[in-house]
Amino acid sequence: MYQSLAMAANHGPPPGAYEAGGPGAFMHGAGAASSPVYVPTPRVPSSVLGLSYLQGGGAGSASGGASGGSSGGAASGAGPGTQQGSPGWSQAGADGAAYTPPPVSPRFSFPGTTGSLAAAAAAAAAREAAAYSSGGGAAGAGLAGREQYGRAGFAGSYSSPYPAYMADVGASWAAAAAASAGPFDSPVLHSLPGRANPAARHPNLDMFDDFSEGRECVNCGAMSTPLWRRDGTGHYLCNACGLYHKMNGINRPLIKPQRRLSASRRVGLSCANCQTTTTTLWRRNAEGEPVCNACGLYMKLHGVPRPLAMRKEGIQTRKRKPKNLNKSKTPAAPSGSESLPPASGASSNSSNATTSSSEEMRPIKTEPGLSSHYGHSSSVSQTFSVSAMSGHGPSIHPVLSALKLSPQGYASPVSQSPQTSSKQDSWNSLVLADSHGDIITA
């Protein structure tokens, strides 16, 4: 039954690594010699007692290990001068010397006195005598094997030569921490850098809980917003109200600004000046009242309100001139009202000759007031040469043959109208008659 345990015992820790606290560890009865279980000695080696950092806690550790084991016959069969307890209790040795271990850990305590070491040795001897006198047999050996191997399995995971002492101390610390606080709530765990207080929440996380619960803006009553904000009192604001409050320091006004009305929404709109309801463009005056385009533009240009007498029922549009007006206009033949009837046959022949060439002549438009600037002496009279026309024949240009410049002015019996020159004679383009100021085109 204990063959597997016996094989594990051969590879276990050295005898000094076991603790002498188990009641079955000190049972050496009749069946103990035949049992394959190894029972270590509970005596503390002299090398251990000579260590300075264990002198103050040696007795406390030994007695504490006895109390940390099973509460069997060894606990009831302890010596008369030994009091079992935890490392934090005061113990009395066989010689009556009082010993009070440190409250935290015997390993890090100050070196003890010589009396405390003697008390520890006496307590160990008393426990050994009690264990040998408690009797036993095969059952006691089996119990010792179970207890010893159970403790060996627990202590074998440590690399320190005395793990059982510190294990009991650590167990007492864990029990004290569990009694004082809840599980996983010790100050050691809270001191870790990776662990934060769950109650402390980042303030910016509130802005990301948009859809976690039904929120409403306390200013405008909005239920949804891209970003929830808070005012100075902690109330929720939508992004628009919160940003407005942050920039201006006041609450965002609930009245929305009036949007520009479309044509369908301007049915009941009328001009504040002329009370018209139809206009191409609505304007506003200095007081902010709507005015029509005519009244608004008149006020802008003249600085005074538009008179009501200028009001028209229809909308006056701009009269634009066609761009191809000069191209479409063709010079027509001169009418009879513009030319005077000739007084002689020579003038009639010349008028007929010049009429045929009127398509090549351009009419000159002048103002009537220009006639006063030209006197009788400065006027250039032109005569017609009939012989020139008859001598040269039709081969000569009719305009050149019909005009003959005379350097001296003379009084003609018949008042002849001045003739317009050809395109080559630009200096003779303006000639005015004495009788009237109209432009005559031959």
From Swiss-Prot:
Localization recorded for this chain is: Nucleus
Q: Which UniProt keywords apply?
A: Activator, Atrial septal defect, Cardiomyopathy, Disease variant, DNA-binding, Metal-binding, Methylation, Nucleus, Repeat, Transcription, Transcription regulation, Zinc, Zinc-finger
Q: Where is the composition biased (Basic residues)?
A: 317-326
Spans annotated as Disordered = 60-107, 314-378, 409-428
Residues in GATA-type zinc fingers run 217-241, 271-295
Fetch the SMART domains from UniProt: ZnF_GATA
Outcome reported for the amino acid change (mutating residue 221 to R): In TACHD; impairs the ability to bind and transactivate the promoter of AMH gene; abolishes interaction with ZFPM2
Give yes or no: UniProt keyword NADP: no
Query: Record's superkingdom?
Result: Eukaryota
- One GO cellular component term, please give it: nuclear body
Composition-biased stretches (Gly residues): 60-82
Where does the protein principally reside? nucleus
Question: What modifications follow translation?
Answer: Methylation at Lys-300 attenuates transcriptional activity.
UniProt entry tagged with the keyword DNA-binding: yes
Concerning InterPro entries, the annotation shows: GATA_N, TF_GATA_4/5/6, Transcription_factor_GATA, Znf_GATA, Znf_NHR/GATA
Q: How does it assemble?
A: Interacts with ZNF260. Interacts with the homeobox domain of NKX2-5 through its C-terminal zinc finger. Also interacts with JARID2 which represses its ability to activate transcription of ANF. Interacts (via the second Zn finger) with NFATC4. Interacts with LMCD1. Forms a complex made of CDK9, CCNT1/cyclin-T1, EP300 and GATA4 that stimulates hypertrophy in cardiomyocytes. Interacts with NR5A1, ZFPM2 and TBX5. Interacts with TBX18. Interacts with GLYR1; the interaction is required for a synergistic activation of GATA4 target genes transcription.
Which disorder is recorded? Atrial septal defect 2: A congenital heart malformation characterized by incomplete closure of the wall between the atria resulting in blood flow from the left to the right atria. Patients show other heart abnormalities including ventricular and atrioventricular septal defects, pulmonary valve thickening or insufficiency of the cardiac valves. The disease is not associated with defects in the cardiac conduction system or non-cardiac abnormalities. Ventricular septal defect 1: A common form of congenital cardiovascular anomaly that may occur alone or in combination with other cardiac malformations. It can affect any portion of the ventricular septum, resulting in abnormal communications between the two lower chambers of the heart. Classification is based on location of the communication, such as perimembranous, inlet, outlet (infundibular), central muscular, marginal muscular, or apical muscular defect.
Could you identify this protein by its name? Transcription factor GATA-4
Q: What organism does the record attribute this protein to?
A: Homo sapiens (Human)
Query: Highest lineage ranks of the organism?
Result: Eukaryota, Metazoa, Chordata, Craniata, Vertebrata
